[in-house]
Regions:
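Conserved C-terminal helix/tail region of periplasmic/extracytoplasmic solute-binding proteins
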Residues: 296-333
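Ligand-binding clefts/hinges and TM-proximal coupling segments of bilobed small-molecule sensing domains
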Residues: 141-160, 237-267, 309-312, 323
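Sec-dependent N-terminal signal peptides
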Residues: 6-15
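C-terminal segment of classical bacterial N-terminal signal peptides
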Residues: 17-26
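Secondary-structure end/capping motifs
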Residues: 225-304
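Short, glycine-/small- and polar/acidic-enriched structural segments
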Residues: 28-167, 173-179, 183-189, 202-206, ...
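Pocket-lining segment of extracytoplasmic ligand-binding domains
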Residues: 90-92, 160, 169-260
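N-terminal secretory signal peptides that target proteins for export/translocation
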Residues: 1-5
Length: 333
């Protein structure tokens, strides 16, 4: 090997090392953020799965890690500043009404994806009287959704008209349905589709009864104030992730298969078809109002006749709209 060739190879090797070092240094300097997600896959959270798996957070200069826990635990972690961004609008709004310093920053699902799915012998909602329904724990989104719909529209109360067994994760509720440990369960679209394939029946969609923000991210007020740029980057990544769902069917199906542990491509495609138009970064004022009103019912202990406070105080709408405008979008009203 000639001296010139050796020199060229040595220079090339040096450049590779230097370039690799620069990349490692840049990655190490990325702000680290923790992003909450619920146990088991959730149809409401598909854009956040995409933002992590497809590198959208990294593209915005954020080093993101998922933290999986129960919904209530995630809200408390956001309040304690242990997790920066948490997609729990139901529990978050309840905490805000009690004075928690939390705010909504960016949306995910703009429609309810909850169903009450039953064993095939249940023909109508009234057939659930005297039966056992699998729910989340009281105060969590799926519990509230089921109790409000059954109470408000069918005059059925937990403990009086039907029994309740609580489960931390949706896959456990699917298994209980299949094993006939329960006759009904609150399931999001993806898990309901899985149960339906096993012979179960989607009895009702709660979105037909109450509007729903789902997966809307909350953060501590101090984080938004002290790390405005980080919050803005997070919003940008989520805007792109919401767009990705509509624009990239195959990539989204891959993510669905991973997070819902689905090997059946046809089932994953069916889930995609259910949710492909469900997402958007906006937090529409009418849906926000419906969210808070659904948390101020007698079933949840809200005093009768007590009015809602000004709920716009619970949204950093200026930052969200500013980010959307910078991305060439007109914020929806």
């Amino acid at each position: 090997m000639t001296a010139i060739r050796k020199g060229v190879l040595s220079f090339a090797a040096l450049m590779i090392v230097l370039f690799g070092t620069q990349i490692s240094t840049a990655f190490a300097q990325m702000p680290k953020i923790k992003v909450g997600r619920t146990l088991g896959g959730s149809g409401f959270h598909i854009p956040s799965y995409i933002a992590v798996d497809k590198g959208l957070f990294k593209a915005e200069g954020l080093d993101a890690d998922f933290i999986a826990a129960q919904a209530g635990v995630l809200v408390r972690a956001a309040l304690a500043k242990e997790i920066e961004f948490v997609p729990i609008p139901g529990g978050g709004s309840e905490a805000m009404l009690k004075g928690a310093p939390l705010v909504f920053i960016v949306g995910e699902s703009l429609v309810s994806q909850w169903t009450i799915t039953t064993t095939p012998d249940i023909k109508r909602v009234e057939d659930l009287r005297g039966k056992t329904i699998g729910l989340e724990r009281p105060g969590q989104a799926a519990y509230t959704e089921a109790v409000v719909v059954l109470g408000k529209f069918f005059k059925m109360e937990p403990g009086k008209d039907y029994k309740v067994i609580t489960f931390n994760a949706e896959p456990d509720r699917v298994a209980a349905l299949i094993n006939k440990s329960v006759q009904g369960a609150i399931l999001s679209f993806p898990h309901a589709a899985r149960a339906e394939k096993e012979g179960m029946k989607i009895l009702l969609k709660t979105g037909d009864y109450i509007p729903r923000l789902g997966g809307t991210f909350i953060a501590h007020k101090d984080l938004v104030k002290e790390k405005r740029d980080v919050t803005k980057r997070f919003i940008r990544a989520m805007v792109k992730a919401n767009d990705y769902v509509k624009a990239n069917k195959k990539g989204t199906i891959d993510v669905i298969q991973k997070y819902f542990e689905i090997k059946d491509a046809a089932l994953a495609e069916g889930i995609y078809n259910q949710v492909q138009n469900a997402f958007g970064p906006e937090i529409p004022p009418d849906l926000l109002k419906e969210l808070f009103e659904s948390r101020t019912t007698p079933e949840l202990g809200w005093p009768a006749g007590k009015p809602l406070p000004d709920i716009e105080q619970f949204v950093v709408r200026d930052l969200l709209n500013e980010t959307l405008k910078e991305m060439g979008r007109t914020p929806k009203k």
